[in-house]
A protein has these predicted regions:
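Basic, Lys/Arg- and aromatic-enriched nucleic-acid-binding interface segment
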Residues: 1-27
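Short, basic (Lys/Arg/His-rich) helix/loop patches that form interaction surfaces
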Residues: 3, 110, 118-159
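Short, leucine-enriched amphipathic alpha-helices that occur as contiguous helical runs
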Residues: 9-14, 114, 118, 140-141
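A short, glycine-centered helix-capping/turn motif at helix boundaries
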Residues: 19-33, 150-152, 163
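Conserved tyrosine-mediated DNA breakage-rejoining catalytic core shared by Y-recombinases
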Residues: 32-83
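C-terminal catalytic core of Y-nucleophile DNA break-rejoin enzymes
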Residues: 61-85, 99-122
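Catalytic-site neighborhood detector that most strongly recognizes the C-terminal catalytic loop/helix
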Residues: 161-187
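C-terminal secondary-structure termini that scaffold catalytic or DNA-interacting sites
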Residues: 187-202
Length: 202
């Protein structure tokens, strides 16, 4: 039975990367998500149960507890909803230990580690033949870039990504579309498709 579920970790990490990109999340923020951290947005009912994501483990100032924020799903990233639905309803139940609340439980039942996510991203990046300068955080940078290009208000973007100062967000405003990051996105999609293929073979 264990071998028949070997595709699940690949599907999980690919979905994590898609979520990090679609909501502009830091590595620790996305890996720390629990099942209860999503809710409907009354102002955007078309997104169903994934209209709002509650980040409870945001980057903290030194000596302070983790910052919390709410991130709204925006139409440009609506595609992530089907990815999340598939993970939550179809795939996660196949692997989640009893009573686990983690959105992305590891094979041992605990939270997936930050190092595991970095290794997964590195593998995707290498498979795509991209520069080593790209890292997991590039997904978040790309989110900000797209939000700026799509004309969202600077303060809204700042609130979405949890930047303490507007100047931090403004660093991204001079960036142009990064083809390399988009290639990474395509590679992640291929990883998901490969994982789905695995479900059909078992």
């Amino acid at each position: 039975m264990a071998g028949s579920k070997g595709w699940i970790p690949a599907f999980r990490t690919a979905t994590i990367m898609k979520a990090a990109y679609a909501w502009g999340l830091r590595r620790n923020e996305v890996r720390s998500l629990d099942m209860v951290d999503f809710a409907a947005n009354p102002a955007a009912r078309q997104f169903g149960d994934f209209g709002i994501i509650y980040v409870r483990h945001g980057k903290a100032m030194r000596g302070s507890p983790p910052k919390r924020r709410s991130v709204l799903t925006v139409p440009e990233f609506e595609w992530v909803i089907e990815c999340m639905r598939q993970w939550v309803e179809e795939v996660r139940p196949l692997a989640a230990p009893p009573n686990s609340t983690s959105l992305w439980p590891s094979e041992r039942g605990g939270m997936i580690t930050a190092d595991a996510l970095s290794r997964a991203f590195t593998e995707v990046r290498r498979d795509a033949g991209l520069d080593e300068e790209l890292d997991f955080h590039s997904l978040r940078r790309s989110y900000v870039t797209h939000m700026v290009e799509d004309g969202y208000d600077a303060f809204f973007i700042q609130q979405q990504v949890g930047h303490e100062h507007a100047s931090t967000t403004s660093i991204y405003t001079g960036l142009s579309p990064d083809y390399r990051v988009r290639v990474v996105g395509d590679a992640i999609s291929r990883t998901v498709q490969a994982a789905l293929k695995g479900t059909k073979e078992h």
